[in-house]
């Protein structure tokens, strides 16, 4: 049967149709090969995390999925600046950077800044020169305790929906006209300059009338 609202398949096989049958006999071997490649990569990047670089927390696009959180491509320059990490330095310590992404809300920026700070606090940074340990690098005792992280780096947990409290609608809320209020607010914003100009002209005309009593009589 077809999937979704698609056409029901009704193929009429002919013209040596056995040639066009797609087989899937290599699935078990692919699984073994992927596992071997993961092990090979983990050994190559040791003691770095086997799953790769740290990714930001972003929301899925479209109104259908925007309540879900997932891993993004890389951190923005604003997020790195808020955490006090340079973009070039971030790449060397396992943090993904995306120069194209822009922060569109304060909440997402603060969430990722906090994520970077948490990662930085847990990170064991091996010194370039063991004899001269620079600021920010871990000591030799801490480096001996380092182990490779096998799972995802700082796994993302979806937020729990807020608890909604039900109550009766008040009389004032029933009388409130949302559309009229929004329309009045838009009108006031559009006419603020014109009304200020009219008020200024009216004040100037009153001052002129007070200064010349003959003009006021006329």
Swiss-Prot record:
Classification via InterPro entries? Ribosomal_eL13, Ribosomal_eL13_CS
Q: Where is this region: Disordered?
A: 196-218
* Keyword tags: Cytoplasm, Ribonucleoprotein, Ribosomal protein
Highest taxon listed in the record's lineage: Eukaryota
Which molecular-function annotation in GO is an example for this chain? structural constituent of ribosome
One cellular component term (GO) for this entry is: cytosolic ribosome
Q: Which Pfam families match?
A: Ribosomal_L13e
* Gene Ontology biological process: cytoplasmic translation
Q: Where is the composition biased (Basic and acidic residues)?
A: 199-218
Annotated localization? Cytoplasm
By sequence similarity, the record places it as follows: Belongs to the eukaryotic ribosomal protein eL13 family.
* Known partners and oligomeric status: Component of the 60S large ribosomal subunit (LSU).
The record describes the protein's role as: Component of the ribosome, a large ribonucleoprotein complex responsible for the synthesis of proteins in the cell. The small ribosomal subunit (SSU) binds messenger RNAs (mRNAs) and translates the encoded message by selecting cognate aminoacyl-transfer RNA (tRNA) molecules. The large subunit (LSU) contains the ribosomal catalytic site termed the peptidyl transferase center (PTC), which catalyzes the formation of peptide bonds, thereby polymerizing the amino acids delivered by tRNAs into a polypeptide chain.
Q: What PANTHER family does the entry give?
A: 60S RIBOSOMAL PROTEIN L13, LARGE RIBOSOMAL SUBUNIT PROTEIN EL13
HAMAP family xrefs: Ribosomal_eL13 (MF_00499)
Protein name from the UniProt record: Large ribosomal subunit protein eL13
């Amino acid at each position: 049967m077809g999937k979704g609202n698609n056409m029901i398949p009704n193929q009429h096989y002919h013209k040596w149709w056995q040639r066009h049958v797609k087989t899937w006999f290599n699935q078990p071997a692919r699984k073994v090969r992927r596992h071997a490649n993961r092990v090979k990569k983990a050994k190559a990047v040791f003691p770095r995390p086997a799953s790769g670089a740290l990714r930001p927390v972003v929301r899925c696009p479209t109104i259908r999925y925007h309540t879900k959180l997932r891993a993004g491509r890389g951190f923005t320059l604003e997020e790195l600046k808020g955490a006090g990490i340079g973009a070039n330095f971030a790449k060397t310590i396992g943090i993904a950077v995306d120069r194209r992404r822009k922060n569109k809300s304060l909440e997402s920026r603060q969430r990722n800044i906090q994520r970077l700070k948490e990662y930085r606090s847990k990170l064991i940074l091996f010194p370039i020169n063991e004899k001269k340990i620079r600021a920010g690098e871990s000591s030799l005792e801490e480096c001996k305790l380092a182990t490779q992280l096998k799972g995802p780096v700082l796994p993302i947990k979806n937020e729990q929906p807020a608890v909604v409290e039900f109550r009766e609608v008040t009389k004032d809320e029933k009388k409130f006209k949302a559309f009229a209020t929004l329309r009045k607010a838009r009108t006031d914003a559009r006419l603020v300059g014109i009304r200020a100009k009219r008020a200024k002209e009216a004040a100037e005309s009153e001052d002129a009338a007070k200064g010349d009593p003959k003009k006021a009589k006329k």
